[in-house]
A protein has these predicted regions:
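Amphipathic, small/basic residue-rich leader segments at the start of a protein or domain
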Residues: 1-82, 101, 105
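A generic, well-ordered mixed alpha/beta core segment in the N-terminal half of proteins
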Residues: 94-110
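A short, Trp-centered hydrophobic/proline-enriched beta-strand micro-motif
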Residues: 109-118
């Protein structure tokens, strides 16, 4: 986050600091505690920051979200992933029927979404689709779908014949949608690899204008990168603070560990 913050951002930072200290750090790391974290987040107005105003959210700016995420992660507290409500992602601004069938249930917590962009290195061609009447027939693979194993639908980039790359809602319970592999990454998040074999999808599941899906997907990727960067900075702040306190403590000689030149050299390199 910037070194100079407005009065409103300073207040937001203090709200997040208090929430992390008084609530999150006192909760056990079990699934049942997520609801407590979520309810307190709603009371403080944090939960709605990622949601559109038309759905009761506050639609916070990227700077506000960066301040909040970095501050929360600087405490290394549990359940940070439960603080903010679901965001519309690539579904932002969609009309009917997707607004009722997928966007509203997503923002209400009734459905879970995932994002399908990355293709396997050995894929013969990108995930493709062909419109047949009112149906879009999709074939292909997505190798890295974050949260895909638990998702109700995937917002997938599909190259539609004669139209170009488009974002398409693919419900995971459709015939031909298969999870080929589940795996996790260093940050604890889980992912899945999917294959699509002659999946019949209503053409109304195309998000926005056909052929204009890549810019929409890249905006989603950009927002996600900002999220990861803010969280990483927050966790690094926690590491530096933890290390600083450790170096202030006494070793067996009774002197602070940080008094040794070699220790200070390593600390400065960090």
């Amino acid at each position: 986050m910037p070194e100079t913050l407005s009065k409103e951002l300073i207040e937001l930072k203090e709200t997040c600091n208090t929430f992390a200290r008084d609530t999150l750090l006192n909760l056990p790391e079990d699934p049942d505690s997520r609801e407590t974290a979520r309810n307190e987040s709603k009371r403080l107005g944090l939960f709605m920051m990622t949601q559109p105003k038309q759905f009761g959210g506050t639609e916070a700016t990227q700077l506000e979200l960066t301040v909040a995420r970095e501050t929360l992660c600087s405490h290394n507290a549990p359940h940070v992933d439960s603080v903010f409500g679901p965001s519309p992602g690539v579904l932002g601004g969609v009309g009917e029927p997707l607004k009722s069938t997928h966007l509203s249930p997503l923002l209400n917590g009734e459905k879970r979404s995932s994002f399908g962009f990355t293709e396997p290195d050995d894929a013969p061609k990108p995930t493709s689709g062909k419109i047949e009447g009112e149906t879009l027939v999709v074939n292909g693979q997505k190798s890295y779908v974050t949260g895909g194993a638990d998702a109700d639908f995937i917002n997938a980039l599909v190259h539609i014949e004669d139209l170009g790359p488009s974002m398409v809602v693919v419900d995971t319970d459709l015939d031909g949608v298969n999870i080929d592999k589940k795996f996790s990454s260093l940050d604890g998040s889980h992912h899945a690899a999917f294959s699509f074999k002659n999946v019949n999808i209503p053409s109304s599941n195309i998000i926005g204008e056909p052929g204009k899906g890549l810019p929409r997907a890249m905006r989603q990727i950009g927002d996600t990168r900002l999220l990861f960067a803010a969280q990483a900075c927050g966790y690094m702040i926690w590491v530096i603070n933890f290390l600083t306190e450790h170096l202030k403590s006494e070793d067996r000689s009774g002197e602070p560990r940080g008094n040794k030149d070699v220790v200070r050299w390593h600390y400065s390199n960090a």
